[in-house]
Regions:
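Helix-helix packing/entry segments at the starts of transmembrane helices
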Residues: 39-41, 99-105, 169-191, 223-259
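Specific transmembrane alpha-helical segments of multi-pass solute transporters/efflux pumps
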Residues: 22-23, 51-103, 139, 219-237
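C-terminal-most transmembrane helix of multi-pass membrane proteins
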Residues: 43, 51, 55, 211-213, ...
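Transmembrane alpha-helical segments that form core, pore/gating elements
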Residues: 46-50, 110-112, 116, 147-201, ...
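Specific alpha-helical transmembrane segments that line the substrate/conduction pathway
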Residues: 37-48, 88-119, 124, 158, ...
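Hydrophobic transmembrane alpha-helices of multi-pass small-molecule transport proteins
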Residues: 50, 122-142, 160-162, 191-193, ...
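Glycine-/small-residue-enriched transmembrane alpha-helix faces in small-molecule transporters
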Residues: 1-37, 78, 86, 144-171, ...
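Hydrophobic/small/kink-forming positions within alpha-helical transmembrane segments
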Residues: 20, 24, 51, 77, ...
Length: 289
């Protein structure tokens, strides 16, 4: 393995850990504020955390590459907004652990999108991974009465949006300055979230102050740090390769939900999670076999 690839893999693994535990912060936030308020505020914090990086990079050659970055950031920001919105609203109705595994389905969706856009042939590993992930999601989310929980449906839609976002970032990461692209997409997400929050939700300062720590983690770490590292890490890692590492996000979400929120998975749900993780890995490891 090339040293650059190893470095990128390590960076993306760190991103997966940050995002996995971010499900806990997001779930705690839902006890006090609306989903769009939480997202809007944490993306504002994420933008602020990026400003010092941009300032110190102002004289570097890559920092002067601005042509087209606004358009690129708006496109990636819209898909990021859709994904994070479906996920955050879904967390009102489901657990952090379940949301982590369902969100992780985007690693199965990415190869299918690549097949669609590039007209690649569907590999056996992709089909096996999709089947395992589908069975796993059925066990995890569908009740004994064959009803799928509303929150799980919303989180599944977020997985589709994140799959598009991953592919878009994979194509843009080598063309633009990492911090600036991250700032633009986060700013787009913050503005859209706050606009929706002003229409449908109520701002209560005392409730916002109660979640200062989850907001700081969700804003500075999950947004400012993680999304910047994602863009930087994907410079030497293709989207399908990055998706393998990001599949571990669901494992860290389950660990965080169990350790911090005392969430417990039933035997049926645990089997579903195991099948989903296996499907995610198989779909990527045997994608080009």
């Amino acid at each position: 393995m090339k040293s650059g690839t190893f470095k990128s893999d390590f960076i993306l693994l760190f991103v997966a850990i940050i995002w996995g535990f971010a499900f806990v912060a997001q779930r705690i936030g839902m006890d006090h504020v609306g989903p769009f308020t939480f997202n809007g505020l944490r993306f504002v914090l994420g933008c602020l955390s990026l400003l010092p990086i941009i300032f110190f990079q102002r004289n570097s050659p890559s920092a002067k590459t601005n042509a087209g970055i606004i358009k690129a950031g708006i496109i990636s920001g819209i898909f990021l907004f859709l994904g994070i919105s479906f996920q955050q609203v879904g967390l009102v109705y489901t657990t952090a652990g379940k949301a982590g595994f369902i969100t992780g389905l985007y690693v199965v969706i990415v190869p299918f999108l690549n097949i669609f856009f590039k007209q690649d042939r569907t590999s056996l590993g992709t089909w096996i991974g999709a089947i395992l992930a589908s069975v796993g999601m059925f066990l995890l989310s569908v009740t004994k009465n064959y009803n799928m929980e509303f929150g799980d449906i919303l989180v599944f839609f977020s997985a589709i949006c994140f799959a598009f976002h991953l592919i878009i970032i994979g194509r843009l990461s080598n063309r633009f300055n990492t911090a600036k692209l991250s700032l633009v997409q986060c700013l787009v997400c913050a503005i859209l979230s706050l606009l929706v929050a002003m229409v449908f939700e109520t701002f209560i300062l005392s409730e916002i102050l109660k979640i200062s720590i989850p907001l700081l983690y969700g804003g500075v770490m999950s947004v400012g740090v993680a999304y910047s590292l994602q863009i930087y890490g994907q410079k030497n890692s293709p989207a399908s390769h990055a998706a393998i590492i990001f599949s571990l996000e669901s494992v860290f979400a389950a660990i965080g939900g169990w350790f911090i929120l005392n969430e417990i998975l039933s035997g049926r749900a645990f089997l579903g999670c195991a099948l989903m993780l296996a499907g995610m890995l198989i779909s990527q490891l045997y994608y080009k076999k």
